[in-house]
Amino acid sequence: MELVVGRVAKSHGIKGELVVEVRTDEPEDRFAVGSVLRGRKPRESTLKSYTVEAARDHSGRLLLRLEGVSDRGDADALRGTLFVIDSSELEPSDDPDEFYDHELEGLKVVLTDGTEVGSVIEVLHSAAGELLSIRRTGETSGELLIPFVAAIVTSVSIADGVVMIEPPEGLLDPDFGDKSNSDNSNSDND
């Protein structure tokens, strides 16, 4: 299975540097000088190899210089390129409570009483922590966002293909937080 470890967001400067959105826990290894990256444009299947010539942090962003990319035009042509690895290249985790995103995607989500909620379609990473994006059973669109925290996610079994949750009241309510349904209208005060 192909996993994205970075995406070229844009060019930086006039010497061909690239701003890369990092999607790996090990950027210092994946993007080290001399590393060979495999990249492709979104929705394309042809992979091209790129050798890292230089890598540096700049204001919290990763800047890369790749061999053969020497000016802004070359760099702009790579905008949107996804750097990928094969999941078989990943080391298995020794921590039973640590998972790769691709291991969680597709798992069935059930309540502690056994009620099926849906399945994990994506793991989102935010400054506040990880969220599981859940597609409800029987629905073809829309999503529920569930914080991936021990207080809500009580267990994960990759072997059984199940994420067990015990959400607080209202978290699974589709109208949760929708102010248009509140009873705070002043129509009686005419």
Swiss-Prot record:
<dbReference type="InterPro" id="IPR002676">
    <property type="entry name" value="RimM_N"/>
</dbReference>
<protein>
    <recommendedName>
        <fullName>Ribosome maturation factor RimM</fullName>
    </recommendedName>
</protein>
<comment type="similarity">
    <text>Belongs to the RimM family.</text>
</comment>
<feature type="domain" description="PRC barrel">
    <location>
        <begin position="95"/>
        <end position="171"/>
    </location>
</feature>
<dbReference type="GO" id="GO:0005737">
    <property type="term" value="C:cytoplasm"/>
</dbReference>
<dbReference type="Pfam" id="PF01782">
    <property type="entry name" value="RimM"/>
</dbReference>
<keyword id="KW-0963">Cytoplasm</keyword>
<dbReference type="GO" id="GO:0043022">
    <property type="term" value="F:ribosome binding"/>
</dbReference>
<keyword id="KW-0143">Chaperone</keyword>
<dbReference type="Pfam" id="PF05239">
    <property type="entry name" value="PRC"/>
</dbReference>
<dbReference type="InterPro" id="IPR009000">
    <property type="entry name" value="Transl_B-barrel_sf"/>
</dbReference>
<dbReference type="InterPro" id="IPR011033">
    <property type="entry name" value="PRC_barrel-like_sf"/>
</dbReference>
<dbReference type="GO" id="GO:0006364">
    <property type="term" value="P:rRNA processing"/>
</dbReference>
<keyword id="KW-0698">rRNA processing</keyword>
<feature type="region of interest" description="Disordered">
    <location>
        <begin position="169"/>
        <end position="190"/>
    </location>
</feature>
<comment type="subunit">
    <text>Binds ribosomal protein uS19.</text>
</comment>
<dbReference type="GO" id="GO:0005840">
    <property type="term" value="C:ribosome"/>
</dbReference>
<keyword id="KW-0690">Ribosome biogenesis</keyword>
<dbReference type="InterPro" id="IPR036976">
    <property type="entry name" value="RimM_N_sf"/>
</dbReference>
<dbReference type="GO" id="GO:0042274">
    <property type="term" value="P:ribosomal small subunit biogenesis"/>
</dbReference>
<dbReference type="InterPro" id="IPR027275">
    <property type="entry name" value="PRC-brl_dom"/>
</dbReference>
<comment type="function">
    <text>An accessory protein needed during the final step in the assembly of 30S ribosomal subunit, possibly for assembly of the head region. Essential for efficient processing of 16S rRNA. May be needed both before and after RbfA during the maturation of 16S rRNA. It has affinity for free ribosomal 30S subunits but not for 70S ribosomes.</text>
</comment>
<dbReference type="InterPro" id="IPR011961">
    <property type="entry name" value="RimM"/>
</dbReference>
